[in-house]
Amino acid sequence: MTLIWIPLIPLMVKIVMKLVPDGKEMGAKALENPNYLDNKLIAQPAAALQLVAKEVMYCAKIVDEMIGKLQSGNGKIDKENAGIVEEKAKILQKLYASINDYFAALYSGGVLTEEQASQSAGMQSILCDIDRIGQLTREIMETVAKQNKGKHKYSKEALKELKKAMEQIQMIYGSCIRAISGNVDMDIKELMRQKEDIMQLDEKMRKNHIARVGK
């Protein structure tokens, strides 16, 4: 996560996301369209950047849901969850493109102050990280699903390790997103400790995989 940008994004502080009004489900086509961006506000960068911040946080929520789908069934990827992850990944890509187009319109308008340009760069960096996490999540889903359909399936131990890893990743990801949205203060030291735990787990998983393959 791009933590260094957090102090530069006051517009993202205390944003309260409400994804689906009244708890009603939205169709896939509606979800692919930006929920907050308004081209009529391009000439008003302060208001426009607030809308961008909300849209970025909406993308963050989508990725959080994608990661959560990789934790069900002790790491096994069933057809339903695979479809959900794939659908959300496509929605994320379209929103990512829409937000970047909106940024381009803001920049070309020549209305951003130096501070607003810095804030925009910070939000773009965070959006890029969120999109990358989402696409990597889809790749994990595709890899596991494909492997489990083949002759050499992942062992139960490997799938349990994957589930544990995704739980830890979702925890650290959630902490970052809550801090960016202004809901909690970020403990950088604790965040780095969690990151180190994930790195150690990654090393352990690799060693265990090699040991299992070598049997």
Regions picked out by a protein language model, each given a short descriptive name:
Residues 4, 8-215:
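Cytosolic, long alpha-helical scaffolding segments
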